[in-house]
Structure formats: C-alpha cells, structure tokens
Curated annotation (Swiss-Prot):
One of its GO terms (cellular component) is cytosol. Belongs to the uroporphyrinogen decarboxylase family. One of its GO terms (molecular function) is uroporphyrinogen decarboxylase activity. It comes from Chlamydia trachomatis serovar D (strain ATCC VR-885 / DSM 19411 / UW-3/Cx). GO terms for biological process: heme biosynthetic process; protoporphyrinogen IX biosynthetic process. Disulfide bonds: none annotated. Pathway: Porphyrin-containing compound metabolism; protoporphyrin-IX biosynthesis; coproporphyrinogen-III from 5-aminolevulinate: step 4/4. PANTHER family: METHYLTETRAHYDROFOLATE:HOMOCYSTEINE METHYLTRANSFERASE RELATED (PTHR21091), UROPORPHYRINOGEN DECARBOXYLASE (PTHR21091:SF169). It comes from the Bacteria. The lineage of its organism: Bacteria, Pseudomonadati, Chlamydiota, Chlamydiia, Chlamydiales. It catalyses: uroporphyrinogen III + 4 H(+) = coproporphyrinogen III + 4 CO2. This is Uroporphyrinogen decarboxylase.
Length: 336
C-alpha cells in the first residue's frame, strides 16, 4: 500500500486543497522558456547548470505550483552510461543492447552540472524540488528503439528473443538510476518522480515481469539511502495499475487511462494518488476547460492524500493562460 510521504512533502501548509504541480510544467508552451533557450541546442541546455536553474524556477514563478521539478530530460542519465544521444529535434540514441551498460564510477563529477543546479535551486526555491528519472523499462525502450517510439517493436522483439540479456539490461539501468537519484537527493532534492511512460505497450503477462518487478527493485535500492519519498507515474490500464500497489512507492500516478473514482470505490485505503487530468483538455477554451476540471474534481474532493497533476505532460501548443487558470481554479476550491 502506498505511503503518504510524497504527498506530505509537497502539500501546501494550512490549506485545505490538493497539492498542485504538472508533468512537463516547464517547456515550449512557456514564452519565457523559449527566450531562455533561444538558438541553443536542447542537449547543451540540459547540461548547463545556469539553464537548469533558470528553467526550473519558471514553474513556481509563472504557474504558482506547489513543487518544482528539476529541468532535465529522461535521457540526461545517459551521460553516466557514456551512451551517445542527441535531439534532432526528437531524441536519438546510439547504443547496441547487447553491450553491457556500465554506470560511471565518478557520478559526482559526471553530473556536477546537475548537482550544482540542485544546490542552487534549494537555496532559491520556496517550494520542494523533485528529482526525476525514467523507470527501467522506459529507459530500456529508448536504448533499444534508438529514441522515442509508439509501438516499441524492437523492444518487444528483443525481450522475447533475448530475455536474459533484457533482464540484465534492466538490472544495469536500475543500478545506475538508483545512484543517479540518490545523489540528487543528497544534493537537496526533496522527493523523486519516476516515469514509466513506455509501459502501456506491455501485455498483462509482461507487465508484472518488466514493470512491477524492476520498479520494486529500483525503489528498494533508492530508499536504502535516506528513504526519500517517491512517486511513480505509469501508463497502464486499471488492472495493471492495481498491481503497482506492491512496489513500495509513496504515491502512485496513473495516466488518463485509469478512472480515479473507480480506484477510490474499489480500494478501501488507496493511499496517496497523483494525477491524472487529461492534458489535451488544456487546449480547450477556458470556460470549457474549467467546466471539465470541476467535473473531474467533483468525485475527488473528499479524498485524502490526493495530488492534482496530469495524465501525461503538458502539450507544446498549450496556452500558458490555461495552465494558470487551472491553478487558479484549484486554489479556490476547498476540499474540506
């Protein structure tokens, strides 16, 4: 059963409303972000301390959210694995999955740009800072596919043809990811968000093997150092979501395929849940958006340890005014 540490870490004090933050809350939809990035390459931007700091600060300053999330990419960890990658503009990865994936022996040096950014952010922020990384299956899918994919054909074929090597790859990713996140917490991050965004492709009989088991192992390893609160975002359907209750996360964050009212009806003590408003609704005219938001929130108002977020990241074409309107609406709605 999920605990409540993540909720308590980011919950606004003395306010009877759910905590608020967004997946991909800083990105191309924000004009100030576009100005920060200008003509620089995305990879250079992700590897620059000052850029990470200034971009991360945009979330709380422009949106009024209750948490900041480190501005990085799920491929940033590949710096520690010495795997070549770039954005052209989408992610492209050069790696053979038959090769052992070995994490750097000096992660403090390899990720000094990131750790310095976190240290600076903790001094400047008035809200908690969240570190994040891809979960093992999702990062493995990027490595095998050579980038983003819709149907993950290479990944599915590889795990069937080379099951032992695929399991070893997940173990290698788990080991490096645990170190990557532990040192961010040691640098000052208050909580961790894991992203299992490729998991919707897996049929049920593979979900337990390649999502539940690796995430359980990863969370256990992370919590050996400092026991930081952890939330897991996972793209899945209802039955697969229920199986995530065994992994040891503090908060579970389903995508928009899971109906939260159904979760609360079926599970007596569901713990802390985060999500899962459809980001496509942020494209609607504001009056329609707010109507959908209020309908979405109505069955959740009496639920404890609920965190408002999206069922996926904010879309690039989203008007920033709509995101701000959502925050304004939420801060005015009592959950008492």
């Amino acid at each position: 059963m999920p605990m409540t540490g993540f909720y308590e870490t980011i919950s606004p004090r003395d306010q009877q409303r759910p905590p608020i933050w967004f997946l991909r809350q800083v990105g191309r939809y924000i004009p100030q972000y576009q100005e920060l990035k200008r003509n620089r390459s995305l990879k250079d931007f992700f590897l620059d301390t000052e850029s990470i700091v200034e971009a991360t600060l945009l979330g709380p300053s422009l949106l009024g959210v209750d948490a900041a999330i480190v501005f990085a990419d799920i491929l940033s960890i590949l710096e520690g694995f010495s795997v070549d990658y770039r954005f052209a503009p989408g992610p492209e990865v050069s790696y053979s999955p038959h090769e052992p994936l070995i994490f750097t022996k000096d992660p403090q040096e390899t990720f000094s740009f990131l750790l310095e950014a976190i240290q600076q952010l903790t001094k400047r922020l008035t809200v908690p800072l969240i570190a994040f990384a891809a979960s093992p299956f999702t990062l493995a899918s990027y490595l095998i596919e050579g980038g983003a994919s819709r149907d993950y054909p290479k990944t599915i074929a590889f795990l069937y043809q080379y099951p032992d090597r695929f399991k070893a790859l997940l173990d290698e990713i788990t080991l490096g990811t645990a170190t990557y996140l532990q040192m961010q917490v040691q640098a000052g991050a208050a909580a961790i968000q894991l992203f299992e965004s490729s998991s919707l492709r897996l049929p049920p009989h593979l979900f337990a093997k390649y999502v539940v088991a690796p995430n359980t192992k990863l969370i256990r390893q992370i919590k050996q150092t400092g026991n930081p609160p952890i939330s897991l975002f996972c793209r899945c359907f209802y039955q697969e979501f229920l199986s995530l209750y065994a992994i040891g996360a503090d908060t579970l964050h389903p995508d928009y395929h899971v109906e939260l009212p159904e979760v609360y009806r079926q599970i007596h003590s569901p713990g802390s849940i985060q999500g899962n408003f459809d980001p496509a609704l942020l494209l609607l005219p504001q009056d329609a958006l707010i109507a959908h938001l209020e309908a979405y929130l109505a069955p959740l108002k009496q639920q404890s340890h609920y965190i408002f977020n999206l069922g996926h990241g904010i879309l690039p074409q989203t008007p920033i005014e709509n995101v701000q309107a959502v925050v304004s609406c939420l801060t005015s709605i009592s959950t008492s």
